[in-house]
A protein has these predicted regions:
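Outer-membrane beta-barrel transmembrane strands
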Residues: 60-78, 85-87, 174-210
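Surface-exposed loop/interface segments of Gram-negative outer-membrane beta-barrel transport/assembly proteins
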Residues: 3-51, 92-94, 102-189, 207-210
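Fold-independent oxyanion-binding glycine-rich loops
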Residues: 9, 84-85
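A conserved hydrophobic secondary-structure block that centers on an alpha-helix together
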Residues: 76-77, 93, 97-98, 104-107, ...
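Short, P/G- and charge-enriched loop/turn segments at secondary-structure junctions
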Residues: 54-58
C-alpha cells in the first residue's frame, strides 16, 4: 500500500512589548530644558525634523511557513519512506531569518525468506541563516537594538536622495545597520547509514552498519 501526504502551516511571531523611550516631541522638549539650564544649544543642530520610532523601524511581525510532503509504501518484503520539508522563518528583526530544506529516504528489503534484511537511511539538509547585528554582531557600530534605543527620534531613516541618513554622531542609523551588515551562514549536511542484518539462528542475529 502506498501513501502520499502533504501538510503545511503558517505562524507569526512578534515583539511582546517595546521599551519606552522619548518620542520626537518629548525629546525636543527635554533637550530644550537641558539647554535652558546649561546654555548648550548644540541640540538645535541635532533636530532633523523627523518623528521616527526606531523600534518600529527595526522590529516586525515575523512569518514562518512550513511545508512537508511524504510518500511511503511497500510490501511484506520491502518498504520505503521518502519525505521532504521546507521552512522559511522570518526573524522579528528586519533582515534576519532562516530557511531550511530537509530530505529523508528510508529503504528496507527482506531477502532469503527474511534471513537477510537490508536497510538504508539517508538524510540531507540545507540550512541558511541570516543574523541581525545584535550583541557583538554589530561590530564597531555597536548593538543594533542598543542603537535603536539611543537613536535621535528626530532623525529620518533616509535622506533626500533615498540613501540611509547618517549624522556625524556616535549613534548609527539602526535601519542602515540592519541592511548593510550582512551576517549569513550556510550549512549543508548529508548522513547515510546502511545496515545488513543476518539471522544466524532463531534468536541469534548479526547486524553490520556502514
Amino acid at each position: 500500500q502506498n501513501n502520499l501526504s502533504f501538510s503545511s502551516y503558517t505562524s507569526v511571531s512578534s515583539l511582546r512589548s517595546k521599551i519606552d523611550v522619548l518620542g520626537a516631541e518629548d525629546w525636543v522638549k527635554a533637550r530644550q530644558l537641558m539647554a535652558s539650564e546649561t546654555g548648550d544649544l548644540t541640540f538645535l543642530d541635532e533636530n532633523f525634523g523627523a518623528a521616527t520610532d526606531w523600534q518600529n523601524e527595526i522590529f516586525r511581525t515575523g512569518v514562518t511557513q512550513n511545508y512537508s510532503v511524504s510518500a511511503s509504501g511497500g510490501s511484506k518484503s520491502s518498504n520505503y519512506l521518502f519525505s521532504l520539508s521546507y521552512m522559511d522563518q522570518e526573524g522579528v528583526v528586519i533582515n534576519s531569518g532562516l530557511d531550511r530544506i530537509t530530505g529523508r529516504l528510508n529503504l528496507r528489503q527482506n531477502l532469503l525468506n527474511d534471513i537477510l534484511i537490508l536497510e538504508a537511511n539517508l538524510t540531507a539538509a540545507n540550512i541558511n541563516n541570516q543574523w541581525a547585528p545584535v550583541g557583538n554582531g554589530g561590530g564597531a557600530g555597536g548593538d543594533l537594538i542598543g542603537n535603536a534605543l539611543r537613536a535621535n527620534p528626530t532623525m529620518p531613516v533616509y535622506n533626500g536622495n533615498g540613501d540611509f541618513f547618517q549624522p556625524n554622531t556616535t549613534t548609527f542609523n539602526p535601519v542602515a545597520m540592519a541592511n548593510l551588515i550582512d551576517d549569513r551562514s550556510q550549512t549543508d549536511s548529508f548522513l547515510a547509514n546502511v545496515a545488513a542484518t543476518f539471522k544466524l539462528a532463531k534468536g541469534l542475529t548479526n547486524k553490520t552498519n556502514v
